[in-house]
UniProtKB/Swiss-Prot annotation:
A biological-process GO annotation: DNA recombination
Binding positions for Mg(2+) 1 per the UniProt entry: 671, 736
Integrase catalytic domain span: 660-835
Modification after translation, per record: Initially, virus-like particles (VLPs) are composed of the structural unprocessed proteins Gag and Gag-Pol, and also contain the host initiator methionine tRNA (tRNA(i)-Met) which serves as a primer for minus-strand DNA synthesis, and a dimer of genomic Ty RNA. Processing of the polyproteins occurs within the particle and proceeds by an ordered pathway, called maturation. First, the protease (PR) is released by autocatalytic cleavage of the Gag-Pol polyprotein yielding capsid protein p45 and a Pol-p154 precursor protein.
Protein name per UniProt: Transposon Ty1-DR4 Gag-Pol polyprotein
Chain residues that bind Mg(2+) 2: 1346, 1427-1428
Enzyme Commission numbers on file: 3.4.23.-, 2.7.7.49, 2.7.7.7, 3.1.26.4
Any one GO CC term of the record: nucleus
Residues annotated as catalytic: 461 (for protease activity)
Species assigned in the record: Saccharomyces cerevisiae (strain ATCC 204508 / S288c)
Region (Integrase-type zinc finger-like): 583-640
Stretches with biased composition (Basic and acidic residues): 1038-1053
Miscellaneous information on this protein: Retrotransposons are mobile genetic entities that are able to replicate via an RNA intermediate and a reverse transcription step. In contrast to retroviruses, retrotransposons are non-infectious, lack an envelope and remain intracellular. Ty1 retrotransposons belong to the copia elements (pseudoviridae).
Site (Cleavage): 401-402, 582-583, 1217-1218
Highest classification ranks of the organism: Eukaryota, Fungi, Dikarya, Ascomycota, Saccharomycotina
Length: 1604
């Protein structure tokens, strides 16, 4: 206090002032804004020591001119000394007026040196002209603290400025980082307040209390510049200073505004975290307070969910509300509203209880000595509000409280309470027993527990499932060492010594008994409310009594402390003494739980499971010995029989004992399979199978339907066949209960023939296993054969029949014999069998013309049932024939998609198997055939093979016509030539066009190398085919080449740019397509004949004869042929529907392509350049038996089987029908597949760009974690409908960039894998045009953005799998899809919901009602088109803020920021926009039309007179029927589709003057007459002439038609 008196009554110097501020009260008023108060204690001591040696001089009392401040007198300043003062600068202000300090004068007149202005400088002298700051922190003794309502402004500073008392000011610290500026401003404002400048600090509304003077402004500027270096200022502060470098007040105003906002949020969070409620205030007020805080935080972007809010509320509950912590913590989905419902209920109950309870006042002395807060607590309150809940609830384990005991309890035992007392009793402490009640029990208490809070009483516990006491005095019928597991609330085991009964004798003279456990290891004697409820006794805490359900009061309840108690005087004592409690004889009369009761209680579990669970203590409360298991074995629960009814267990081999007495073909199994959908009417949809029980011989018959007559015909046939062929009679036929077997017609037939029908029982398919397993085996074989051969689906039954023939010939591992051997038949002659789908050439014995070819390509199916011939499918004639006149095509093996068999052929094996049939062809027939071929210029097939040591010029030596050297006499070099499996061409999508994006009708691409072959019946095609002779390699090189990927085996030899070759024209007179055949003279034709007999010369011939030698050039080096780009080697062809990129002449084009159901990377029918060899035709004496399959021409065209063209037919097109069918046209494909963009792309530069785009897309997929890379799934384990096919597509964008995209085949996606109700929205064109118009009228900035791989940001909810990309090389695996891949049905909707949610929640946007994908707030409008965004705003900074938020979540690329005031060009959704803000906007498509129209292959007139109108007015279209070839019709429809599609796109974008003509012609797309085509060409010509026209908008001007 001495220091305080000194500062108030005696004048002191600056130095002594520093030393005098040592009072402890200074620290109690410490300002919270001062963060370095604790660091100045050493400075106090040092300054006190230094100033104690100085003399004190009285301060001047002169009053300055400024009425608000007092100026100090100038004093001499000693030289600066920094030695003894290493602390921060402590400057003491002499008076409150800063204008007198020369240090803070005009910026250009500041007399200081750098070391004097350092924050570490401390002026030791008392006459320093610089202000000194004391080491102590806080409000000075002579200055009142700021008001609590305004932290930053001292409202009394204006009055205190007049005082002459000295003030001790501490400077703010130096600003060292822009992030520390908010905290630094707080210290700077405190510095101003301590400098008596609190009145100039802006308040919350931005205005100071008083006007600032010039001197104060100078002081403000200089101090701010000193302590806040410009390089550490935030950007917004620099922006303010850039406008006015002295505008410190604006900086302070904005800082205070920011701090107020942050302070409010911080205060709300602190308030919410420190909530306290005990019912002292109304519950409504508490709820309003909490909900307002939560709403305010949510509005400020701080989201408080229900779980966090409830936890914060419950943590602050006390008193009677405290139990909600325990009852509500198990509710996972609890809401704030539900919690407040409970709080309101307790509050209302509390208010009612206070009105009904007598008021017992405590003695003041008791309140002073007892600091416990006695309030209602936890679990007993639950019973009071909901008694029924306790009656019906049981805990899995018995729990007991383990509450720490109190040592303040007296040793007196007095629990005698008046029986007539029914009023609630409230005991605040043990001294409140002054109502005539005694705390001593009248009975003998053998154990004195002095630690009980209320001795002689039982604690009522709603959480305990068992009653526990520590004394055995009240236990009746006790049994020792019970096997009971009891745990407390902390999961700790409580050892139990005995179990018995606890008997009560209540005040209504009724007796009740409950079970009780004895243990000395608990703090209180616990009375379980659950066990009381089991005997119809409940605790009413509103009346504080125990009562029955009829309202009879049994005993009062005493509340002491936080718990409720019942006196032990109602317990009946037992006759057992305490010392012998562990020796009590075990009572065998203890009643056990009946097993049916336990069975029902434990959810009807079986006895074995229940017994095992009790034995291992997984179920507590009772043990295995407590259950009566005597009836468990024989007990039959009727509910289990009904609810758990199952089928009987099928015993394996049980049927065999019933068939032991049957002979072969007496017991048959039969079953029907089908239907197979999407087949032509001529193909069967069902088949019926029969299996003999004894021999396991199998028969299959095709069915077109399941009618009674059809089934009866089959039964008649099979029975007659068995009777006549095997001399056996069928006795029993086993079948299922299908309607085709249970009908009356078949039943009568079987009854008439004495056959017993044996039906399976209901839903017992396993009893019909023989027939079921046969059907499954045959279908597996069918799918495999169709997949291997590539044949179309309508031949499925042929595959079934082929499999049946083979299966009957294979031995069974069980019987060691085949079915044919059991039936007494000979084994299958494999020399008569061909692989299913083997390509063959069939002789046409009845051609339409003598000059037409007589060989028809076909595919072998199976041996004939009715002849010695073979059933062969002829795609060109759309039928099957039974014939022996066929020739096997060597090298044309079945297509094996999944394996690389390119280096393998089965020609030698097939020759060896069929060698026995070679003798059927006489030599004179061969000679006669050769002579005929020479005379008619017919060319038989020859082998063109290469010499391994001559890669440059390989010449094929001609052989004389009489040479009949068989294929087996070939040299070793010929055997070394690798032969490639020639596979059936795959099905090609009919909607894919080859000329959809290029100007010419035929796409320019590298041609595929065809295998040269002609049939034995003659006919030569004049085809100009570039034949490439591949290199013959050594064995080592050949094996290495075979290990390469099959997808790239032709890539190097197909390129015209990399290979030199000679065109080898192969003439033919039987071809029908002569459009591209060059004119060749007869002499040249004779010279180029390749004779039939094959021969390989070991060395190049010395003399090259011009009439029998074909020169072939090959690449110069072996490495040049086999070299592949390293990057392409890692890019195998994906599983895509292959299509030949170019239609080129193929001499083996007669071999028809076969439709396949699955995709494959191999291009069907393409192999190495080895030619095919023929085998001598197999002749039989039997006539051909032709079975025609009637397939409609539409089906033929849909399958797109390009082979020998059938006779061209005319198609009649009706105008009205064509106009009505316009909507059914499918869109044109505008993208490239992998093989088109990379594999067969001969444009090297374009190919490299597509490869780069491919790798970029793969890296993006991995970056976005599109699929789960941790686990790969087997294709067989996944539901097929959840497997999505994928592919890579390539295209070139409008800006010239090449793009690759990995997409899913959504067109074949199963409907169960997506929600059809979800929609992907894009901005409507009119919405975009409206936004552009508003932007022009309001001088908006237009910013264009693009989000890369937008769909991949959206998660996918469904469980979907895709095949891995081709570069992973795992064709047999699947990966789990995690992101919305492009192409999926739901991807667009998922992305729209994702970006919509982000724009609304994070960017503060709202979707415009009526226009989806248009979002708006007060400053910015956004138009969303999938991954493109167009932003409109008045202020460009608003657009930038949105961009920054988007970049935080998405890979956002700015296409055009739009910040220039000059003309800016945009390309928005195909529109070329030129925009100058505030002046005009021009919309056009000149660049796009200049690029696209020439590619349409339309005859343009670029230099002629321009058209003045898009069409001739008043012209009517002729309605005569259009008669046109089908191929020509498709070509013209395809052309119309491209032309009208482009015109419609342009018209609806901005060329509205063309829409009438466009819509009229669009109705005639399917009626491509010459007149319609001419009108369409005229429209395109007009668009070409006016491509530079633009739609021009001027600001505040309406557009006129002249602008178009």
């Amino acid at each position: 206090m001495e220091s305080q008196q000194l500062s108030q009554h005696s004048p002191i110097s600056h130095g002594s002032a520093c030393a005098s501020v040592t009072s402890k009260e200074v620290h109690t008023n410490q300002d919270p804004l001062d963060v370095s108060a604790s660091k100045t204690e050493e400075c106090e001591k040092a300054s006190t020591k230094a100033n104690s040696q100085q003399t004190t001089t009285p301060a001047s009392s002169a009053v300055p001119e400024n009425p608000h401040h007092a100026s100090p007198q100038p004093a001499s300043v000693p030289p600066p000394q920094n030695g003894p003062y290493p602390q921060q600068c402590m400057m003491t202000q002499n008076q409150a007026n800063p204008s007198g300090w020369s240090f803070y004068g005009h910026p250009s007149m500041i007399p200081y040196t750098p070391y004097q202005m350092s924050p570490m400088y401390f002026p030791p002298g008392p006459q320093s002209q610089f202000p000194q700051y004391p080491s102590s922190v806080g409000t000075p003794l002579s200055t009142p603290s700021p008001e609590s309502g305004n932290t930053f402004t001292d409202s009394s500073s204006a009055d205190s400025d007049m005082t002459s008392t000295k003030k001790y000011v501490r400077p703010p610290p130096m600003l060292t980082s822009p992030n520390d500026f908010p905290n630094w401003v707080k210290t700077y404002i405190k510095f101003l307040q301590n400098s008596n400048l609190g009145g100039i600090i802006p308040t919350v509304n931005g205005k100071p209390v008083r006007q600032i003077t010039d001197d104060e402004l100078t002081f403000l500027y200089n101090t701010f510049q000193i302590f806040a270096p410009s390089q550490f200022l935030p950007t917004w502060v620099k922006d303010i200073l850039s406008v006015d470098y002295t505008d410190i007040m604006k900086i302070l105003s904005k800082s205070i505004e920011k701090m107020q906002s942050d302070t409010q949020e911080a205060n709300d969070i602190v308030t919410l975290a420190n909530l306290q409620y005990n019912g002292s205030t109304p519950a409504d007020a508490f709820e309003t307070k909490v909900t307002n805080i939560i709403d305010r935080l949510n509005n400020n972007g701080i989201h408080i969910n229900n779980k966090v809010a409830c936890q914060l509320i419950m943590r602050g509950l006390s008193g009677e509300y405290k139990f909600l912590r325990y009852t509500r913590h198990r509710h996972l989905n609890m809401t704030v509203a539900e919690l407040f419902l409970d709080i309101h209920a307790i509050y209302e109950e509390q208010q009612g209880s206070r009105n009904s309870k007598p008021n017992y006042r405590r003695n003041p002395s008791d309140e002073k000595n007892d600091s416990r807060s006695y309030t209602n607590t936890t679990k007993p309150k639950v019973i009071a509000r909901n008694p029924q809940k306790t009656n019906n609830s049981k805990s899995k384990t018995a729990r007991a409280h383990n509450v720490s005991t109190s040592n303040n309890s007296p040793s007196t035992d007095n629990d005698s309470i008046s029986k007539s007392t029914t009023e609630p009793i409230q005991l605040n402490n043990k001294h409140d027993l002054h109502l005539g009640q005694k705390l001593t029990e009248s009975t003998v208490n053998h154990t004195n527990h002095s630690d009980d809070e209320l001795p002689g009483h039982l604690l009522l516990d709603s959480g305990a499932s068992r009653t526990l006491i520590r004394s055995a005095h009240h236990i009746h019928s006790a049994s020792s060492n019970p096997d009971i597991n009891v745990v407390d609330a902390q999961k700790r085991n409580i050892p139990i010594n005995a179990i018995g009964d606890l008997q009560f004798h209540f005040q209504d003279n009724t007796k009740t008994s409950i079970k009780v456990l004895h243990t000395p290891n608990i703090a209180y004697d616990l009375l379980s409310l659950n066990e009381l409820a089991a005997v119809d006794i409940t605790a009413c805490f509103t009346k504080n009594v125990l009562e029955r359900s009829d309202g009879t009061v049994l005993a009062p309840i005493v509340k002491y402390g936080d718990f409720y108690w019942v006196s032990k005087k109602y317990l009946l004592p037992s006759n057992i003494s305490v010392p012998t409690i562990n020796n009590v004889h075990t009572s065998e009369s203890t009643r056990k739980y009946p097993y049916p009761f336990i069975h029902r209680m434990l959810a009807h579990a079986n006895a074995q499971t229940i017994r095992y669970s009790l034995k291992n203590n997984t179920i507590t409360y009772f043990n295995e010995s407590d259950v009566d298991w005597s009836s468990a074995i024989d007990y039959q629960c009727p509910d289990c029989l009904i609810g758990k009814s199952t089928k009987h267990r099928h015993i394996k081999g049980s049927r065999l004992k019933y068939q032991n007495s049957y002979e072969p073909f007496q017991y048959l199994h039969t079953d029907i399979f089908g239907p197979v959908h999407n087949l032509p009417n001529s193909a069967p949809s069902y088949f019926i199978s029969f299996t003999d029980e004894t021999t396991k011989f199998r028969w299959v018959y095709p069915l077109h339907d399941r009618r009674e007559d059809s089934i009866l015909d089959v039964f008649t046939t099979i029975l007659a066949f068995i009777k006549n062929q095997f001399q056996a009679s069928v006795l029993v036929i086993q079948m299922d209960r299908g309607s085709e077997y249970t009908n009356r017609t078949l039943h009568k037939f079987l009854e008439k023939n004495g056959i017993t029908p044996c039906y399976t029982t209901t839903a017992d398919s396993r009893a019909h296993g023989v027939a079921e397993r046969l059907n499954r085996t045959l279908l597996d074989d069918c799918r495999t054969q169709l997949q291997c051969s590539g044949l179309p689906n309508h031949l499925w039954f042929s595959a079934i029949e082929f499999s049946t023939i083979v299966r009957n010939s294979l031995a069974s591992p069980k019987s060691k014999k085949s079915a044919r051997q059991h039936a007494g038949l000979a084994g299958l002659d494999i020399s008569t069998l061909l692989p299913f789908g083997q390509p063959v050439i069939v002789n046409d014995h009845n051609p339409n013309s003598k000059i037409h070819p007589r060989g028809i390509p076909g595919y072998a199916l199976h041996p004939s049932r009715n002849s010695y011939g073979y059933i062969i499918y002829l795609p060109s004639l759309k039928k099957t024939v039974d014939t022996t006149n066929y020739v096997i095509l060597q090298g044309k093996e079945s297509r094996l998609d999944q394996f690389n068999y390119d280096a393998l052929t089965f020609d030698e094996d097939l020759n060896r198997l069929t060698a026995s049939y070679h003798s059927f062809i006489a030599s004179n027939e061969i000679q006669e055939s050769n002579d005929l071929n020479i005379e008619s210029d017919h060319d038989f097939q020859s082998d063109i093979e290469l010499h391994p040591e001559q890669p440059r010029n390989v010449l094929s030596k001609a052989v004389s016509p009489t040479d009949s050297t068989p294929p087996s006499t070939h040299t070793e070099d010929s055997k070394r030539v690798s032969k490639t499996n020639i596979r059936a061409p795959r099905e090609v999508d009919p909607n894919i066009s080859e000329s959809n994006i290029l100007p010419s009708k035929k796409r320019s691409s590298t041609p595929q190398i065809s295998n040269i072959e002609s049939t034995g019946s003659g006919g030569m095609h004049k085809l100009n085919v570039p034949l490439l002779a591949p290199m013959s390699q050594s064995n080592t090189h050949e094996s290495s080449h075979a290990s390469k990927s099959k997808d790239f085996r032709h890539s190097d030899s197909y390129s015209e740019n990399e290979t030199n070759h000679t065109n080898v024209p192969i003439s033919s007179t039987g071809g029908t397509n002569n459009k591209t055949v060059p004119q060749i003279s007869d002499q040249e034709t004779e010279k180029r004949i390749i004779h039939r007999s094959p021969s390989i010369d070991a060395s190049p011939p010395e003399n090259n004869s011009s009439h029998n030698i074909v020169p072939i050039k090959t690449p110069t080096t072996v490495s040049e042929q086999n070299t592949e780009e390293s990057i392409i080697a890692d890019l195998p062809l994906p599983d895509l529907p292959p299509e030949s990129p170019t239609e080129f002449p193929d001499p083996f084009k007669e071999l028809p392509p076969i439709n396949s159901r699955q995709t494959n990377s191999s291009l069907g029918g393409i192999g190495d350049s080895n030619a095919y060899t023929t085998i001598n035709s197999k002749k039989r004496s039997l006539e051909d038996n032709e079975t025609e399959i009637k397939v409609s021409r539409d089906t033929w065209n849909t399958k797109n089987m390009r082979s020998l063209e059938p006779p061209r037919s005319k198609k009649r097109i009706h105008l009205i029908a064509a106009v009505k069918a316009v909507k059914s046209i499918k869109p044109i494909r505008t993208t490239l597949r992998y093989d088109e963009a990379i594999t067969y792309n001969k444009d090297i530069k374009e190919k490299e760009k597509y490869i780069e785009a491919y790798h970029k897309e793969v890296n993006q997929l991995l970056k976005m974690k599109t699929w789960d890379t941790d686990e790969y799934y087997d294709r067989k384990e996944i539901d097929p409908k959840r497997v999505i096919n994928s592919m890579f597509i390539f295209n070139k964008k409008r800006d010239g960039t090449h793009k690759a995209r990995f997409v899913a085949r959504g067109d074949i996606q199963h409907p169960d894998t997506y929600d059809s109700g979800m929609q992907s929205n894009t901005v409507h064109h009119y919405a975009l045009m409206t936004s552009l118009s508003l932007a022009l009228d309001n001088n908006y900035y237009i910013t264009q953005l693009d989000i890369s791989s937008a769909y991949l940001y959206a998660d996918i909810k469904e469980e979907l799998y895709i095949r891995p990309p081709p570069h992973l090389g795992m064709n047999d695996k699947l990966i789990r899809l995690k992101k919305s891949l492009y192409g999926l049905k739901q991807s667009g909707a998922n992305w729209y919901e994702t970006i919509k949610s982000y724009l609304i929640q994070q960017c503060g946007m709202e979707e415009v009602r009526g226009w989806s994908c248009v979002f708006k707030n007060s400053q910015v409008t956004i138009c969303l088109f999938v991954d493109d965004m167009v932003l409109f705003s008045k202020n460009l900074n608003s657009n930038k803020r949105i961009i920054e938020k988007l970049k935080m979540q998405y890979d956002t690329k700015i296409i055009n920021l739009g910040e220039s005031d000059e003309e800016i060009q945009y390309d928005i959704l195909g529109l070329e926009i030129k925009y100058q803000r505030g002046k005009y906007m021009k919309l056009g498509m000149e660049n796009s039309l200049t690029e696209k129209i020439p590619k349409l292959n339309v005859p343009l007139n670029p230099k002629g007179r321009k058209l003045s109108a898009p069409g001739q007015p008043g012209l009517y279209i002729d309605q005569d029927e259009l008669e046109i070839d089908e191929d020509e019709y498709k070509e013209k429809v395809h052309e119309m589709q491209k032309l009208i599609g482009l015109a419609s796109y342009v018209g609806y974008k901005f060329r509205f003057d063309l829409l009438y003509y466009i819509n009229t012609l669009a109705q005639h797309i399917l009626f491509p007459s010459r007149q319609v085509l001419d009108m369409t060409y005229e429209l395109i010509q007009f668009m070409w002439d006016t491509r530079d026209k633009q739609l021009i908008w001027h600001k505040h001007k309406t557009s006129s038609d002249k602008n178009i």
